[in-house]
Amino acid sequence: DRLRTGILIGADIIAVLIPILCVSRFQLILAAALAVITYLMMDIHIDPLQMIISAAVLFVGLLAAYIILTIARSHDVEYLNGIFEMKNSRTPIFVTQPYMYIANNYDNFDCMVRAMASGYSHSFGLKMLFPLWALTGLKFLVPSLTAFPLFTTKEELTTVTLFYDAYYDFGILGVVLLGCVLGLLAWYLTDMVKHIRNPIGYLLYAQIAVYFGLSFFTTWFSNPTTWFYLAVTGAAAVYGEWRQ
């Protein structure tokens, strides 16, 4: 029992240290969100007072880590607020950054839609298939597969929304089709979670939940990292079910 507890504590410490050592605020938030959702989905009885205290401690800890990582990334607050065109250049970055990422990402989507309307050609599936080109190395052998301009309002702000690549590929039809596929995925996961018997299954559910919840942040399902995470988690979930 002590060995098992020690291994679990060590794994938790490593999981927290990885995003900190990578100086990645998003990875830190993602790790915390996955842990919280997985824990809540496991239907473990939690005292309300204990839950409130834990949530407060987690929030304060994440906020402190976010600020520290922002400083570690050498992000000057006034410089970033200048890019965001904030009226008050001294507004705390942890207040302006999340809001401006959301607002600017939809501005980037609008910028791309206007570019398509002005005569740029759609990519007809090549953008959404970027994980295939990246994970197989084809993007290096055939550079034309990924040679598409990124339409953004500012050179420094390159994050986009979930539907960016879908519209880039097929316009409104691409957005509708992706929405239908994601809707079916949500229905399947909602049904699947009723029959899950191991924590890894809940972790897989939590990953999709985070991707849906942060749909304004990036094109999750045309990102190679997303599919790598899903493949590893899915394999672990299948192995866990097999062991049981």
Question: Residue locations for each model-derived region?
Answer:
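Membrane-interface helix-loop junctions at the exits of transmembrane helices
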Residues: 19-25, 132-136, 216-217
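General N-terminal targeting signals
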Residues: 45-46, 149, 230
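Small-residue-enriched transmembrane helix-hairpin modules in multi-pass membrane proteins
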Residues: 62-182
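Hydrophobic residues in alpha-helical segments
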Residues: 1, 41, 113-116, 167, ...
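Hydrophobic alpha-helical segments of polytopic membrane proteins
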Residues: 2-89
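Short, amphipathic, aromatic/basic-enriched membrane-interface segments that mark the entry/exit
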Residues: 1-4, 22-23, 148-149, 195-201
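Charged, low-complexity, helix-prone segments enriched in Lys/Glu/Asp/Gln
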Residues: 1, 85, 101-108, 189-193, ...
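Hydrophobic alpha-helical segments
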Residues: 155-244
